[in-house]
């Protein structure tokens, strides 16, 4: 059967999982392997997401399940994003228990983060609905690679998101992450149109996506689509996972990217991992 969650449209045989390792064909029905089974829980400052213009100075309960529908060669959380549920320790935590845990630790919101939360969409929606009923925020930290119909089911419960816009080149997306650019742009626009507070992160990798003309095109697209006020975070790359042979991003490259963004009309530009 074919999964309709993301643009990969995986054809999944009986008893098998798709590319994300978290959705299984069980008798012709797609089920989430990781529903209510988070592998990571933490209390983080909201700025760590990073979200700089959404209730700064507050904390959030961060939650992640295993799996991702990208294969980023530079993934900093590959131990869990590229793992199956059986590969890692995990908790048993229902949506109501997540909300109770959040309130117990006096966090005003929940962040679905660290891996690709959209691969466990059902768990997020059920948790996010209860979170809203309890007066809590819902925050998504995502690469944004999802089909628009399932995304619509989540948007009413989403308050803020940081979208990892990995480059402004479809070729780089295919080469580095195994996906495509346009669905990510569609996700950003859908979030904006739904009234979700959006911030953008762009990890600048030397020799991969550090061409300033491409950075300019990305910033121009953001401005042209009404996102000039969306904070843009240029993040510094460090060697990791399958990109151990690439040096850290020079600070002058990040500063050049910031200058380009400001020239194009981005109002809030930040440098991360510096």
Task: Identify the meaning behind each predicted range.
Residues 1-65, 78-82:
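N-terminal [4Fe-4S]-dependent radical SAM core
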Residues 4, 66, 70-73, 129, ...:
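Core alpha-helical elements of the protein kinase catalytic domain
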Residues 9-42, 216-218, 222-274:
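A broadly conserved sequence feature marking short terminus-proximal activation segments
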Residues 60-62, 66, 70-108:
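Glycine-rich active-site/cofactor-binding loop and its immediate structural neighborhood
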Residues 72, 163, 269:
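Conserved, mostly hydrophobic/aromatic
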Residues 95-249:
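Conserved AdoMet/S-adenosylmethionine-binding subsite of the radical SAM
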